[in-house]
Structures are given as structure tokens and as C-alpha cells.
Regions:
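Glycine/proline-enriched, intrinsically flexible loops and inter-domain linkers
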Residues: 1-136, 142-284
């Protein structure tokens, strides 16, 4: 699973080596036993390790609950039935995505937007060309070369954004699983802001993710305007606060993400002060 840990401090965002500790895929538990040396290495890089330890334990509790629920399903219905149901759900998501795409008129729909450039005065331009043909959709993105700032995004972040945004327009009732991705193809030039390569900084990638949703919505609004909401706040702002507790003298760290607002829908106004799109939304 994924969780936010507030105080892995960074020293800037010129490249990924400045963005705090990097942890490869490693086992925190092995055969149910805590690998204490791994945990200590992680906590040593925190300013408030007692809080981060609670975060880690919460993540592991969520994993254990997930394992228990899957085992309970297998015990009740049998492993083969559970696996078959999973495959059927993926196939169902694919069918719904294809049916939804087929309801959009064939054609190529283009849209571009601007994004603040952290390296120099002026803006960067992002653009998308969405080609709908039958029950398939291809999305191609153009953006400037990756920058020495944390707003670059790796290709997997672009993919998850595309899957979310396409689902919201094509058919919001599609189950969120890999089946919905089968009719979609995505391309973007390597080494650009929207498809960066090592050692690009990526800590603030949620900001361009939000703008990519705006791109997709802007393009598809030309074909099915009744299905697309107006542009939302277009960013995810966050602030980290740190200080000493006057009662205990202990250090504390607090991270808060700040919601902007959602755009109007076809028949309703938007909402104020809420998170939108690639923030607290159920993503793949």
C-alpha cells in the first residue's frame, strides 16, 4: 500500500538525490517477522521517528487485514473461484470501457494548457492529442524537456492519471482494475516533464498529474461536453509545519494538503475547498 510520511526532509528538488531517503522494494517483514534493521534505517532518517513508526505499523496493519480478507474469500469460495472472479471482473471492466469509448464519435481531439516553469520566467506548455477509433483510444502527450525541479512525472504516474481521467468521462461506473486499461494506449516522449527519466526530481508530481486531467477533460469536452466537468483547481498544494510542543518539549511535524475546488458539472455547481482528481480519489 501507499502512505504519506510527513518528515522525510529533502534538500531541494534539482534531482532525485535531493528528495529524501530512497527505499527500493525490500521486505520489512519476512515470514511474519519484523526486519528490525530495515525499520531502524528508515526511522533514522526521520525527525519524529515515533510518529513514523506509527505510520509504518498502520501500513502493516492494513496489509494484514487485506491478507485476512483474501484468505477468507478463498476459504469460503475456493482459490480457483476467487481467481476466476478476479479475471471476470477485469474482463467486465474492459467491456464497459470499450462500450463507453465506442459511444464517443471517432476523431482526434486536441487540447493544450500552461504550467508554471520553476526554472525560468514564463510557462510551460502541455498538450494532448486523443484519437478515438471504434472502441479504442490513444493518447499522445507533448511537454517540455524534464526540469531541475520536483514537478516531473514518471510514465507510470502518467498512466494512472490517464486511467482515472478516461474513466471519469467514458464511464465512471467501471470497476477500477487493469481491465479498463486494455483499450487505452498512451505515448509521451522520454526525457520530458510528463515522461521523465532518471535522475529527474518527482516529489511534486501530483501537480502536473492534476494538469494532465485538465488536458484530457479539455480534449474530450469537444466530443462529449455533457460528460466533462469544468476545470478544477488544477494543482495540489501542501504545507509542512514543524515545531516544539511547549508542554513536552518534543518535536512535532505536521503535513497538510490543501484542497482547492471542483469545476461545475453539466447540471450542478462545483464544490469549494475539496480535493479533486489525483489526490484523494480511488486510483489504480
Amino acid at each position: 500500500n501507499t502512505a504519506h510520511h510527513a518528515d522525510f526532509a529533502d534538500r531541494g528538488h534539482a534531482h532525485i538525490y535531493q528528495e529524501g531517503i530512497r527505499i527500493p522494494p525490500i521486505r520489512l517483514y519476512r515470514a511474519g517477522e519484523l526486519m528490525n534493521d530495515v525499520q531502524e534505517l528508515i526511522l533514522l532518517n526521520c525527525q519524529v521517528p515515533r510518529e513514523r513508526l506509527s505510520d509504518l505499523r498502520a501500513q502493516m496493519a492494513a496489509n494484514r487485514l487485506g491478507v485476512e480478507r483474501v484468505r477468507a474469500l478463498c476459504d469460503k469460495y475456493g482459490r480457483d473461484t476467487v481467481l476466476a472472479a478476479g479475471r471476470a471482473l477485469q474482463d467486465y471492466a474492459e467491456r464497459k470501457m470499450r462500450a463507453g469509448i465506442a459511444s464517443i464519435p471517432d476523431g482526434t481531439y486536441r487540447f493544450s494548457d500552461r504550467f508554471d516553469n520553476p526554472e525560468m520566467d514564463g510557462d510551460m506548455e502541455f498538450s494532448v492529442a486523443i484519437t478515438v477509433k471504434g472502441d479504442e483510444m490513444h493518447l499522445h502527450f507533448d511537454s517540455p524537456p524534464q526540469v531541475r525541479a520536483g514537478i516531473n512525472m514518471v510514465f507510470t504516474a502518467l498512466l494512472s492519471t490517464v486511467y482515472y481521467a478516461a474513466k471519469t468521462v467514458v464511464d465512471p461506473t467501471i470497476p477500477p482494475n487493469s481491465g479498463l486499461a486494455r483499450p487505452l494506449t498512451v505515448t509521451a516522449t522520454e526525457g520530458t516533464v510528463l515522461n521523465c527519466v532518471h535522475p529527474a526530481a518527482v516529489n511534486g508530481r501530483i501537480a502536473p498529474c492534476q494538469r494532465v486531467v485538465d488536458l484530457i477533460h479539455g480534449a474530450l469536452a469537444q466530443a462529449v461536453p455533457e460528460r466533462v466537468i469544468a476545470a478544477c483547481s488544477g494543482v495540489c498544494a501542501s504545507a509542512t509545519f514543524i515545531g516544539d510542543d511547549p508542554g513536552t518539549g518534543k518535536l512535532w511535524v505536521y503535513l497538510e494538503t490543501i484542497g482547492g475546488g471542483s469545476g461545475a458539472r453539466a447540471g450542478k455547481d462545483g464544490l469549494d475547498g475539496v480535493h479533486v482528481h489525483m489526490t484523494n480519489t480511488s486510483n489504480l
